[in-house]
Curated annotation (Swiss-Prot):
GO terms under biological process: defense response
Keywords for this protein: Disulfide bond, Knottin, Plant defense
PROSITE patterns, sorted: CYCLOTIDE, CYCLOTIDE_BRACELET
Free-text description of this protein's post-translational modifications in UniProt: This is a cyclic peptide.
SUPFAM superfamilies: Cyclotides
General function of this protein: Probably participates in a plant defense mechanism. Has cytotoxic activity, active against a human lymphoma cell line with an IC(50) of 1.6 uM.
This protein's domain notes: The presence of a 'disulfide through disulfide knot' structurally defines this protein as a knottin.
Cyclopeptide (Gly-Asn) crosslink location in chain: 1-31
Disulfide bond sites: 5-21, 9-23, 14-28
Protein name: Cyclotide vibi-H
Entry similarity comment: Belongs to the cyclotide family. Bracelet subfamily.
Length: 31
């Protein structure tokens, strides 16, 4: 499922990509 990573990506990319999160609909989610 998609779990919110408590990070938005409206202005900057997701820093949480290092733990497997990605940007979707202006919010970072973990797949």
């Amino acid at each position: 499922g998609l779990l919110p990573c408590a990070e938005s990506c409206v202005y900057i990319p997701c820093l949480t990509t290092v733990i497997g999160c990605s940007c979707k609909s202006k919010v970072c989610y973990k797949n």
